[in-house]
Design a protein with these regions (language model features):
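Catalytic strand-loop segment that frames the active site of acyl-thioester-processing enzymes
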Residues: 2-40
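Acidic, aromatic-enriched beta-alpha/helix-loop junctions
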Residues: 35-56
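HotDog/MaoC-like acyl-thioester-processing domains
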Residues: 4-5, 12-16, 86-114
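Hydrophobic beta-strand-centered segment that forms part of the acyl-chain substrate-binding groove
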Residues: 50-84, 89
Length: 114
């Protein structure tokens, strides 16, 4: 399994969306990262932010690079996390944050090109 379980998703407007996700222990991304203490890789978190931004906000721009990313706490198997997305079309930026129990686990800014 490569995708989280989507428990809830909401598009607030043309530039904001949020999802409630469950991270099943059987996700491919947990295997070997790290043995005995699996955590969700940062590259997966960035990929999911892009994927759900395309899906929910209709962003057609392509990935250019990560400008800023901050990992504050690991995302673990069986956790429920909230993914917040903000599209800034005039700047070509996608802001994302993963939250667990109200605390930010990771956040970042992705540059996109049209």
């Amino acid at each position: 399994m490569m995708q989280p379980e989507v428990l809830q998703q909401q598009r607030d407007d043309a530039t904001h969306a949020s999802l409630q996700l469950r991270l099943p222990a059987g996700l491919l991304w947990f295997r070997g990262h790290f043995p005995g203490h699996p955590i969700l890789p940062g590259v997966t978190q960035i990929n999911w932010a892009m994927q759900y931004a395309h899906q929910l906000l209709g962003i057609e721009a392509a990935f250019k690079g990560v400008e800023v990313v901050k990992f504050q706490q690991p995302l673990l198997p069986e956790q429920q996390v909230r993914l917040l997305l903000e599209w800034q079309p005039e700047r070509g930026k996608l802001l994302f944050s993963y939250r667990v129990g109200g605390a930010t686990a990771s956040s970042g800014k992705i540059a996109l090109c049209r």
